[in-house]
């Protein structure tokens, strides 16, 4: 049986013990933890089932495992304006900004270290997803599990036709130029 422990940890595999633990109590139902070049851990804290009075909101946290301090965080203003009860992720970009996928609502944003939103995109594609999926009472959702930004010179793009004219009909349907 798998359980969500609302805990982050670093495990030393050979000796089979934790070298670092953070939680429970600090985050709830988090996703997408990743190590940053500075040794810190970045993750999406979904915030589901957070205890009152600090109820439903999500945030991105950058934790310093050396002292368990939150070195940086991002949350909505007001807090409930940024909430994804499931899925989602965050990825630090080479320029220091953070790419965020607010998964349940299909929203992508890039924010600066100073919390300024540089750009925003909302997935325009909705599909049948079952009752209450993505926070929708209609059963239609535009949820997205995660986002990743590829650099123009990324080897994964080598030899691929990325000419937007090739996808003209799709771009017109979705309202892109």
What are these regions (language model features)?
Residues 1-177:
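Histidine-/acidic-rich catalytic cores in large beta-rich domains
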């Amino acid at each position: 049986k798998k359980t969500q422990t609302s805990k982050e940890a670093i495990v030393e595999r050979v000796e089979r013990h934790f070298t670092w633990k953070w939680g429970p109590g600090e985050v709830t139902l988090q996703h997408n933890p990743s190590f940053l070049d500075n040794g810190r851990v970045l993750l999406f804290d979904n915030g589901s089932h957070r205890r009152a009075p600090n109820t439903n909101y999500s945030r991105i946290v950058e934790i310093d495992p050396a002292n368990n301090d939150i070195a940086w965080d991002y949350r909505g203003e007001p807090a409930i304006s940024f909430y994804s009860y499931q899925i989602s992720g965050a990825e630090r970009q080479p320029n220091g900004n953070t790419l965020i996928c607010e998964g349940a609502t299909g929203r992508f944003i890039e924010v600066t270290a100073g919390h300024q939103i540089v750009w925003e995109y909302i997935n325009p594609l909705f599909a049948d997803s079952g009752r209450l999926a993505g926070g929708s009472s209609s059963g239609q959702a535009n949820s997205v599990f995660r986002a990743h930004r590829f650099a123009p010179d990324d080897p994964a793009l080598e030899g691929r036709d990325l000419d937007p004219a090739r996808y003209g009909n799709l771009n017109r349907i979705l309202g892109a130029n």
